[in-house]
From Swiss-Prot:
Xref: SUPFAM superfamilies: Ribosomal protein L1 (SSF56808)
GO cellular component, one term: large ribosomal subunit
InterPro entries per the UniProt record, alphabetical: Ribosom_uL1_bac-type, Ribosomal_uL1, Ribosomal_uL1-like, Ribosomal_uL1/biogenesis, Ribosomal_uL1_3-a/b-sand, Ribosomal_uL1_CS
HAMAP family in UniProt: Ribosomal_uL1_B (MF_01318_B)
Protein encoded by which gene: rplA
Subunit and interaction comment: Part of the 50S ribosomal subunit.
Phylogenetic classification of the source organism: Bacteria, Bacillati, Cyanobacteriota, Cyanophyceae, Nostocales
Purpose: Binds directly to 23S rRNA. The L1 stalk is quite mobile in the ribosome, and is involved in E site tRNA release.
Molecular function terms, GO-annotated: rRNA binding; structural constituent of ribosome; tRNA binding
GO biological process terms, semicolon-separated: regulation of translation; translation
Protein name per its UniProtKB record: Large ribosomal subunit protein uL1
Keywords: Repressor, Ribonucleoprotein, Ribosomal protein, RNA-binding, rRNA-binding, Translation regulation, tRNA-binding
Length: 238
C-alpha cells in the first residue's frame, strides 16, 4: 500500500532539490521547512559503512552538544549511601537505591536518563527488559555507569547525548531544536560529525559516511555534503 503524503509535506518537499547542500544552507532550509504546529527537533540521519552484527563494526558513544539540546532532561540516579546525597546535591530529579529499583520495576519511568554507580549494576541488571527497549539501560560506553555522579548529571543536563548505530548501520540523532539559529545547529552538527569520525569502528571498511541527511521532525529530508562539514572550522560556525 502506498503511503499517502500530506499536502503540507509535498509542498515542503518541493523546496528541497535532489542534491547535496552545504551545511549552513541545509540547516537554513531545515528551519524553513519546520512548519508543524509544535516545536520540532532538528534530526540527523546518517548511513554508515558498517555492519553492526560484527562486534568490530558497532558504534555506540556519546556526544556533548555545545549549544545544548533545547530540551529539559530529567535525570534519575541509582546509587548507595553518600552517592545518593551527591546525586541530590548535583540536581538529579529522581534518586535512590534499592527502593528506586523497586519503583522502576513497578512501572516508574518519569525520567529521560538513568545513571547508576558500578556497585549497584548487578541489581539494576534485572531491569534490563524494562529499560533496554526504552534506551534507558545504564552502560559504561554511554557514560551512565560511573562513580562521578555530579559530572555525569551536569553533562547530560547540559546537552550530552548517547547514540548508537542501529542494526542496519544507520545513526538517528536529535541535535537541537528547529528553533535554534542555523549557526547554533551547525556548531552541534559539527560536534556530532567529529564524534562519529573519532569513534570510527576498527572493522569499518571502505567509505565510512554513505549518506547524510538532516530534517525537522515533520519536515523533508535534506542531503548534506559531509566533506564540506568536515572542512568547516568551528570558528566559522560559532
Amino acid at each position: 500500500m502506498t503511503k499517502k503524503v500530506s499536502r503540507r509535506l509535498r509542498e515542503l518537499q518541493a523546496k528541497v532539490e535532489d542534491r547535496e547542500y552545504g551545511p549552513l544552507d541545509a540547516l537554513s532550509l531545515l528551519k524553513e521547512t519546520a512548519t508543524a504546529k509544535f516545536a520540532e527537533a532538528a534530526e540527523a540521519h546518517i548511513r554508515l559503512g558498517i555492519d553492526p552484527k560484527y562486534t568490530d563494526q558497532q558504534l555506540r558513544t556519546t556526544v556533548a552538544l555545545p549549544k545544548g539540546t533545547g530540551q529539559i532532561v530529567r535525570v534519575a540516579v541509582i546509587a548507595r549511601g553518600e552517592k545518593v546525597t551527591e546525586a541530590s546535591n548535583a540536581g538529579a530529579d529522581v534518586f535512590g537505591s534499592e527502593e528506586l529499583i523497586d519503583e522502576i520495576q513497578k512501572g516508574r519511568m518519569d525520567f529521560d536518563k538513568l545513571i547508576a554507580t558500578p556497585d549497584v549494576m548487578p541489581q539494576v541488571a534485572k531491569l534490563g527488559k524494562m529499560l533496554g527497549p526504552r534506551g534507558l539501560m545504564p552502560s559504561p560506553k554511554g557514560g551512565t555507569v560511573t562513580f562521578d555522579i555530579a559530572s555525569a548529571i551536569a553533562e547530560f543536563k547540559a546537552g550530552k547525548l548517547e547514540f548508537r548505530a542501529d542494526r542496519t548501520g544507520i545513526v538517528h540523532v536529535m541535535f537541537g531544536k528547529a528553533s535554534f539559529s542555523p549557526e547554533d545547529l551547525l556548531v552541534n552538527l559539527k560536534a556530532l560529525q567529529e564524534t562519529i569520525d573519532r569513534n570510527r569502528p576498527s572493522g569499518a571498511k571502505g567509505r565510512y559516511w554513505r549518506t547524510f541527511y538532516v530534517s525537522a521532525t515533520m519536515g523533508p529530508s535534506i542531503r548534506v555534503d559531509i566533506n564540506a562539514l568536515r572542512d568547516y572550522k568551528l570558528t566559522e560556525a560559532a
